[in-house]
Structures are given as structure tokens and as C-alpha cells.
From Swiss-Prot:
<dbReference type="InterPro" id="IPR018218">
    <property type="entry name" value="Scorpion_toxinL"/>
</dbReference>
<feature type="modified residue" description="Arginine amide">
    <location>
        <position position="72"/>
    </location>
</feature>
<keyword id="KW-0964">Secreted</keyword>
<feature type="signal peptide">
    <location>
        <begin position="1"/>
        <end position="8"/>
    </location>
</feature>
<feature type="disulfide bond">
    <location>
        <begin position="19"/>
        <end position="70"/>
    </location>
</feature>
<dbReference type="InterPro" id="IPR002061">
    <property type="entry name" value="Scorpion_toxinL/defensin"/>
</dbReference>
<feature type="disulfide bond">
    <location>
        <begin position="23"/>
        <end position="45"/>
    </location>
</feature>
<feature type="domain" description="LCN-type CS-alpha/beta">
    <location>
        <begin position="9"/>
        <end position="71"/>
    </location>
</feature>
<keyword id="KW-0800">Toxin</keyword>
<dbReference type="GO" id="GO:0019871">
    <property type="term" value="F:sodium channel inhibitor activity"/>
</dbReference>
<dbReference type="Pfam" id="PF00537">
    <property type="entry name" value="Toxin_3"/>
</dbReference>
<keyword id="KW-1015">Disulfide bond</keyword>
<comment type="similarity">
    <text>Belongs to the long (4 C-C) scorpion toxin superfamily. Sodium channel inhibitor family. Beta subfamily.</text>
</comment>
<keyword id="KW-0732">Signal</keyword>
<dbReference type="InterPro" id="IPR003614">
    <property type="entry name" value="Scorpion_toxin-like"/>
</dbReference>
<keyword id="KW-0027">Amidation</keyword>
<protein>
    <recommendedName>
        <fullName>Toxin Td6</fullName>
    </recommendedName>
</protein>
Length: 74
């Protein structure tokens, strides 16, 4: 008998250009909605700069400083 366990992750939502999803000048619920859209359970606008989400599926791409491509034209 097997069991499938999906590890859920947290982190900054990432745009197609590799940058963090900005929440500057957005309404308070913006990040929570964006996190919900990718099947995250909760999220908020971190320091009024970028959307941070909790409990997202492993398939969601998140921003990572080690692989950051923001502003590099990729």
C-alpha cells in the first residue's frame, strides 16, 4: 500500500521574466488572490514589495536568489 504525499512549498511568486511578483501600489488582497490562483493556501505582500505565498503545490515556480534571472533579459 502506497501513499502519495505532496510537499507544499512557500516563497515569492515569480513573473515570466524571472522577477518577483510586485505588489507595490496594489490593494491589500492582491497577493492573497494571486496565491489562491496558483492553488496556494495563503499569501501577503511582503514589505509592500513582493507577493509571498504559503502552501503552494510543488509545481509552482518561485523566485530563488540562486537562480535569479530578473533584469537579465531572459
Amino acid at each position: 500500500i502506497g501513499m502519495i504525499v505532496e510537499c507544499e512549498k512557500e516563497g515569492y511568486l515569480m513573473e515570466a521574466n524571472g522577477c518577483k511578483r510586485s505588489c507595490t501600489l496594489r490593494p491589500g488582497h492582491y497577493c492573497a488572490n494571486e496565491c489562491s490562483y496558483v492553488k496556494g493556501k495563503n499569501g501577503y505582500c511582503y514589505a509592500w514589495v513582493a507577493c509571498y505565498c504559503y502552501n503552494m503545490p510543488d509545481s509552482v515556480k518561485i523566485w530563488d536568489s540562486a537562480t535569479n534571472t530578473c533584469g537579465r533579459g531572459k
